[in-house]
Amino acid sequence: MKTLYSLRRFYHVETLFNGTLSLAGRDQETTGFAWWAGNARLINLSGKLLGAHVAHAGLIVFWAGAMNLFEVAHFVPEKPMYEQGLILLPHLATLGWGVGPGGEVIDTFPYFVSGVLHLISSAVLGFGGIYHALLGPETLEESFPFFGYVWKDRNKMTTILGIHLILLGIGAFLLVFKALYFGGVYDTWAPGGGDVRKITNLTLSPSVIFGYLLKSPFGGEGWIVSVDDLEDIIGGHVWLGSICILGGIWHILTKPFAWARRALVWSGEAYLSYSLGALSVFGFIACCFVWFNNTAYPSEFYGPTGPEASQAQAFTFLVRDQRLGANVGSAQGPTGLGKYLMRSPTGEVIFGGETMRFWDLRAPWLEPLRGPNGLDLSRLKKDIQPWQERRSAEYMTHAPLGSLNSVGGVATEINAVNYVSPRSWLATSHFVLGFFLFVGHLWHAGRARAAAAGFEKGIDRDFEPVLSMTPLN
């Protein structure tokens, strides 16, 4: 086993630019990497790489704490969260902290506590990162073999994978415990317009939970993004947490099978590429979730979804014109279809007009008006509550549209306001990050496969055109 632990610091990949610049005593000659290649110099220095990762975690947690406190400092309780450009407080509110019926914020102290806790823990991580980057041992293999590793040691790598899976499983169960025992979470579907409640009757049926994975991603199906009750979400986290923990134990106790040893590339850069690929998938899924799902991301905090704002507009004008005497059941629109109501391809009664394309929207302010065959005409005439009118009017004017210069709303609207929905920001940012992570996955996967095949040499420097040109200066 000891033969794996090599103190060789040179990792043979050709690098660009000059090697004369020495940074922190690590120049290109000793490490095989130029200054700009950053942590690549630490590939075989497990102690220093630990420092880089812990310091990075410290930066992440510091951002979370500082941004959290910034949002608390700027928060105005009289305005909805989505009008204030907030992206962290909506997550805390969704977890049931500081909010009451209808998503109204009744206490900002839990948000303050969250920010301070993150700041304090970021200081601990920052200290640990600096310690391991500058003072701690360069390599962990000799002094702390449990924390040491060599990238090609397949058994150790799957053990580390197992530990990570167990930690992810514990994270999933933290949400379950919050929903079950520690005050509950915010349920946008609670009667009368949403409230915080404990989730007692979990959905644990595998046919339901895994049925989401087998659904089509299109239209009214919507794959896992179509989940619309908290029992399914929390039950899904029970399943996910259990699978992650059991899978983690499995990977700690077992060694990779022969087919896995043959199929995968076993190097640091290969693991980096696998991780980037996984993060890319997470980014794309998160993008779709925050854009379409108003249960995991309640509209009270994140603003309405696109389809929701569109349906809200149709509903608002149906209410107005019905009050003015229109017969909404039979009024004909300019196309010959129903002006307010029409039938979907499968026969349900739906809102007419341009919003017909969003007919499969489900939203808590609208569902009480549906019957067995779609929207119920008698309920539309008799049962519309003031809170439904208020909420749809609010959502109609806060569609998740907007440009980078923060002039929100429909581009042709002359009375545009400075409003960009957090859904727009979160969906766009996660799509862009997911894309770049995917490109990074392809890049590092290509390099890792080439290195494993033995032809990672970069460009042949002997015949590079620039060598025969006169210096720029």
Swiss-Prot record:
Recorded GO molecular functions are: chlorophyll binding; electron transporter, transferring electrons within the cyclic electron transport pathway of photosynthesis activity; metal ion binding
Chain sites annotated for binding [CaMn4O5] cluster: E367
Tell me the compartments it is located in.
Answer: Plastid, Chloroplast thylakoid membrane
Query: What residues form the membrane-spanning segments?
Result: 69-93, 134-155, 178-200, 255-275, 291-312, 447-471
Question: What high-level taxonomic lineage is stated for the organism?
Answer: Eukaryota, Viridiplantae, Streptophyta, Embryophyta, Tracheophyta
Q: What does this protein do?
A: One of the components of the core complex of photosystem II (PSII). It binds chlorophyll and helps catalyze the primary light-induced photochemical processes of PSII. PSII is a light-driven water:plastoquinone oxidoreductase, using light energy to abstract electrons from H(2)O, generating O(2) and a proton gradient subsequently used for ATP formation.
Q: Which residues form the propeptide?
A: 1-14
SUPFAM superfamilies assigned: Photosystem II antenna protein-like
Q: Which gene encodes it?
A: psbC
- What is this protein called in UniProt? Photosystem II CP43 reaction center protein
As for family, the record states: Belongs to the PsbB/PsbC family. PsbC subfamily.
